C-alpha cells in the first residue's frame, strides 16, 4: 500500500491484514461524501456499502477474525434493489432501469467506450456477419475466450449457459454458414486444441451482453 506519491523507493509487500484495514478505512471515510440513492453509472453510498460488505464477508480469511455482523450491517444499508424477472435484462443495452444493478460502467459510444469492449474482444472477426445482414458491427478482435469446460459446467436448462456462445455461426443475411478467412466454418468449439497456437474458432465466446450494430468509434 502506497499513500505517499513522492516516495521514490520501490514499495514492499503489505501484509493482507493491513491491506484489509486500509480498504476498510478508505470506504468508511468516503461513504458520507457520496450521494445516496441510486444513480446509474455513478459511485454511490450503496456501491461503497456493497464493497464494504464483500470485504467483511472475507474478513476471516484476510485478518483471522470474522466480521459477520459488520457484513450484515453493511448489507442492510444497501436499499432499493430487487432481482429482475428476466436474467438477461440487466445485460441489455437499455438497462438503465434495471432494478438489480448496484453499480454499472456504461459501455457505449455515447460514453466514449466504443460499445462493449470486452464482448468485442472475444468475437471472431467475421462474427459481424452473424450479427447484422450488412455485416455492420463496430469491431471484433478474436482476442479472448472461455476456459475449456466452463460452458458444460452449466446445466443445459441453466439460463446462464446462454452467456457463452458456442457452435456454428450463421449469416444474418441469408442463413448460410459464416466462414472464417480460410474458408472453414466459423464453428466455436468449447475445447482449445493448442494453447500456444489455438485455432481461430477455439473456445466459447462471451455472449452475455446485448450487442449493437450502431456503436462506432
Question: Where are the model-predicted features located?
Answer:
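Aromatic-anchored glycine-rich loop motif in surface-exposed flexible loops
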Residues: 1-44, 56-63, 215
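Short edge-strand/loop segments of extracellular domains
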Residues: 3-5, 76-79
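Active-site-proximal structural scaffolding
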Residues: 16, 41, 45-46, 71, ...
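Alpha-helical solenoid scaffolds that mediate protein-protein interactions
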Residues: 30, 71, 77-82
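TPR/Sel1-like alpha-solenoid repeat signature
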Residues: 49-52
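Short, solvent-exposed loop/turn segments that connect beta-strands within catalytic domains
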Residues: 63-64, 113
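Elongated scaffold/linker segments in the mid-to-C-terminal portions of large proteins
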Residues: 80, 84-217
Amino acid at each position: 500500500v502506497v499513500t505517499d506519491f513522492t516516495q521514490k523507493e520501490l514499495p514492499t509487500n503489505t501484509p493482507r491484514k493491513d491491506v484489509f484495514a486500509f480498504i476498510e478505512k478508505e470506504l468508511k471515510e468516503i461513504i458520507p461524501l457520496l450521494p445516496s440513492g441510486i444513480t446509474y453509472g455513478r459511485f454511490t453510498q450503496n456501491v461503497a456499502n456493497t464493497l464494504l460488505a464483500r470485504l467483511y464477508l472475507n474478513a476471516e480469511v484476510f485478518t483471522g477474525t470474522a466480521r459477520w455482523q459488520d457484513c450484515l450491517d453493511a448489507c442492510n444499508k444497501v436499499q432499493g434493489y430487487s432481482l429482475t424477472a428476466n436474467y438477461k435484462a440487466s445485460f441489455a443495452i437499455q438497462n438503465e432501469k434495471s432494478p438489480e444493478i448496484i453499480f454499472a460502467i456504461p459501455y457505449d459510444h455515447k460514453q466514449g467506450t466504443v460499445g462493449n469492449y470486452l464482448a468485442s474482444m472475444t468475437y471472431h472477426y467475421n462474427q459481424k456477419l452473424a450479427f447484422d445482414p450488412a455485416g455492420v458491427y463496430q469491431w471484433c478482435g478474436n482476442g479472448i475466450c472461455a476456459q475449456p469446460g466452463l460452458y458444460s459446467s452449466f446445466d443445459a436448462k441453466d439460463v446462464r449457459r446462454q452467456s457463452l456462445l458456442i457452435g456454428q455461426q450463421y449469416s444474418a443475411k441469408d442463413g448460410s454458414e459464416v466462414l472464417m478467412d480460410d474458408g472453414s466454418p466459423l464453428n466455436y468449439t468449447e475445447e482449445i486444441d493448442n494453447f500456444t497456437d489455438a485455432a481461430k474458432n477455439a473456445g466459447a465466446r462471451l455472449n452475455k451482453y446485448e450487442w449493437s450494430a450502431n456503436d462506432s468509434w
